[in-house]
Amino acid sequence: MRIPRGTYRGIEEGTHWHNYTFYSYNKLNSLFRPRLSYELACFIEDHGWEAVAHYPAVPEGNGTTSEPLRDGIPPDIVCSVRIIAAGCGLGEIGFSKVFLTKEFGPRVRLGLIFTDCELEPDPIIHTGDICLHCGACARECPGNAIPSVKDVNKRITVSLGDTSVWYGDVRMGRCTLSHHGMNNECSPFLKKEFPNMAFDVRSSEMTEEEAYIMSYTMAQGTWGRKPDTNKVMGYYDYIMTHTGYFAICGAKGCIRACMDMLEKTDRIENKFHNRFYYKKSWALPNKPEKVSDGVNPYREEYLDKTYPGIRENEYKKTE
C-alpha cells in the first residue's frame, strides 16, 4: 500500500508530527492496509482457495512461551514480510533495509497472504535494480544507524532460490532510539523536556530491546512535579493516546533522503511537479543548551523567580 508523500511534509518542515504516525506508519499498517489484505483473502477464498492473511509483526522475544518443536527451531515464528515480498518479485530491499518498489520507491507498506492457490511468480528484482547505493540514507540518518555502503562487512545476504540479495546491517538500537524520539537531533520534544541530556545516539551500543524499553518507559512515564498530566514526555503520551503509537524521526534517511534521490534520478515511476526538498533539512544540536550552576538549579531557579532575594547569602562559592 502506498504512503502519500505529503505525510512526510509536516516533519520535514518541523511543524506537524501526527500525519507520519497515522498515515505513514501505525494506522496505515494496522487499520488501512489490513482491510486490503482481508478483501483479497476473501476474493481468493471466493474462488475455492484457502487464504491466510498474515499481519507483519515480530516474534515473541522472551523465550518462555512454548517449547521448540525440535532443537534449533524457535517455537514462535513470524515471517519477514520484506524478504517474502522480495522473493515474490514485488521490489527490492534497499540498502537501509526499507523495501523499495519501482512505482513508489520506499513509500510502501506491505501485507502478506499465504494460500494454496498456485500463482505464476514474478521475476526477482536484483540488488541495485532500484536502490542506487548512493549512501544518502546513511548520510542523512540522524542516529547513524545505517552503515557505509562501502563497508562490505556490514551487509546481510539472503538467498531467494537461486538468487542472492543483500542490504545493510542496520544498527537497530540506534534506529529505534531515533524512531521513538530518544534522539535530541530529530526530536524537538525531547530537546524541550531534556535540553541538557546530550545523549549521543550516533555512538550508542544499545540493543533494539534496550532501546524499546528506554523509549516506552520515557514516553509513558510520570513525574509528580510535571504540570497538568504529570507526564514526562507530554507529546509522546498525547500522540499514543490518539493513535496508539508514536513515531518521531519521520524516516529522515531511510525514506525521505532515499525518496528524493530516486525521484531525482528517475528510478521510480511516481512523479511530482515539485521537488520534495526545497531547503536544507533542520537538525537540532545535541550539545546542552545551558549548563546550570548551583547545588539544586531546579529549586534555586524556582525560588529566585517566585521569591526574589530570598536566597541572598544562602551560600557562597569559595575559590
Task: Give the predicted meaning of each segment.
Residues 2-23, 114:
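Residues forming anionic-ligand binding surfaces in small-molecule and nucleic-acid pockets
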Residues 1-2, 146, 317-319:
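Generic low-polarity alpha-helical segments
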Residues 255-319:
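C-terminal non-catalytic accessory extensions
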Residues 4, 120, 263-264:
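Short, glycine-/Ser/Thr-/acidic-enriched flexible segments
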Residues 11, 20-28, 102, 117, ...:
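Generic signature of intrinsically disordered, low-complexity segments enriched in small/polar residues
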Residues 22, 26-260, 270-278:
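Catalytic cores of enzyme domains
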Residues 8-10, 52, 267:
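Short, solvent-exposed secondary-structure capping/transition elements
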